């Protein structure tokens, strides 16, 4: 199982229409390694919050990318990921596409039902 973190985003649920806080599972800036006493895994972040990761001058910083988007360019500071999520109200399985600038989830690109997983994004 790969390491992951959580990004919290406010969005209407595409299944029930209720405004909800969606908890999106991301592999960006996630790793079972870390500093003594804590790992880059299973942490919650708000949209726009800097995710804990290696310092920029550390050679491991560049491994922040999840590489789960076929449109991404290696070496770019931008990555996108379709993340698993679910509605806390109706429990519908969802996806949320997030755009990252390095180790920051910048914005929501799309929200939909998991059955309609977007083309070009790995599950």
Over which residues does each language-model region extend?
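Short, flexible, mixed-charge glycine/proline-rich loop motifs
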Residues: 1-9, 74-82
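Amphipathic, positively biased hydrophobic alpha-helical segments used for protein targeting
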Residues: 11-13, 114
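Short cysteine-rich clusters marking metal-coordination/redox-active sites
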Residues: 13-16, 87-90
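Short recognition patches in nucleic-acid-associated and regulatory proteins
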Residues: 20-73, 98-101
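A short, surface-exposed interaction/processing loop segment used at functional sites
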Residues: 100-123
């Amino acid at each position: 199982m790969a390491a992951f973190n959580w990004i919290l985003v406010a969005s209407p649920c595409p299944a029930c229409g209720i405004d909800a806080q969606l908890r999106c599972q991301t592999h960006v800036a996630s790793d079972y390694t870390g500093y003594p006493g804590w790992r880059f895994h299973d942490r919650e972040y708000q949209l726009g919050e800097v995710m804990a990761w290696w310092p920029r001058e550390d050679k491991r910083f560049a491994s922040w990318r999840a590489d789960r988007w076929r449109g991404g360019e290696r070496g770019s500071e931008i990555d996108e990921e379709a993340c698993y999520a679910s509605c806390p109200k109706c429990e519908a399985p969802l996806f949320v596409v997030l755009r990252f600038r390095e180790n920051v989830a910048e914005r929501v690109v799309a929200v939909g039902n998991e059955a309609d997983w977007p083309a070009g994004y790995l599950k």
